[in-house]
Amino acid sequence: MKVWLCLGAVVLLAALATTTVTGQRGGAFRESRDHPAIRYSDGPRHDAVTALDRAVQAGEVALVFEPTSGYLRSVLEALDVPVESQLTVFSETSFQAHRINPENPRAIYFNDTVAVGWVRGGDVLEVASLDPTQGVLFFSIDQQPTDRPQIRRNDQCLACHLSWDTLGVPGLLTFSTLPMPDDPNAYAVGWVTDHRSPLQERWGSWYVTGAPPSVRHLGNTTEPIEYVPGASTDPTPALDTLEGLFDLRGYPTPYSDLVALLVLEHRTHMTNLLVRMGWETRVADYEAARAGRPPADQAAAIR
């Protein structure tokens, strides 16, 4: 991370100040993720999830399958992801959307470099892992009992996790989504949030525990909301626990904590920013080498 910050600052600041003649939205990486300097699809990987898969296939680590949660607890333990980070969201914003609802919310767990998504009854565990050079990689683990489950790359996730909202690099994002009415013709309404978003615009279709009643937000409401951007929102239920809202079997903890939500939203934008800085610098150094110029860090020192 420190290397990215040192090498990437000049390149990123220049890119942020530039508007392209093609009319592309600014502030995003514009090269291919498989640019020779990046090689996102086939470059070497050194992330925690890839290391775990190698250990599992070598028989050095055993992942234990449980009837309700599958490999969830075992994977969290192996990757040192705390169960206290659990967040629950019932918007259908996953490729396992057909299984997600207020009575069966998707659970998300995270640490500094890994995020794990679990849907009770789902076919796979969803895993995102921050590689020191490649950025955020996406994986899935089949929720079927076997001696050595494989952790496979899953670029299907890039349909949502590679966009302008992730700064043009494979990255992380959180949505605030208004609960859907019971109408098959209704359209989902939502927007990306991070640490810069007003609290009153955050957490639509998320359960939020531990928030004081004075904090206005869009969480804890499963009924359709008449929402006007910028307008004051009605108070939502203040929850101390998830108990009584839905069947908690399989969930390691009965919480979806406010503090964990705040940390995750800060992490998403910061992760994407650091990845983009790294990619911008590598492309700049690659092009400089082809042209016989010094790399970006040396050029900055010369100036």
Model-assigned labels for residue ranges:
Residues G26-G122:
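N-terminal alpha-helical interaction blocks
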Residues M1-W4:
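Positively charged n-region of N-terminal signal peptides that target proteins for export
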Residues Q24, N111, G117-R303:
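Sequence context surrounding c-type heme c attachment/ligation sites in exported
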Residues T19-G23:
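Sec/Tat signal peptide C-region and signal peptidase I cleavage site
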Residues L7-A17:
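Bacterial N-terminal signal peptides
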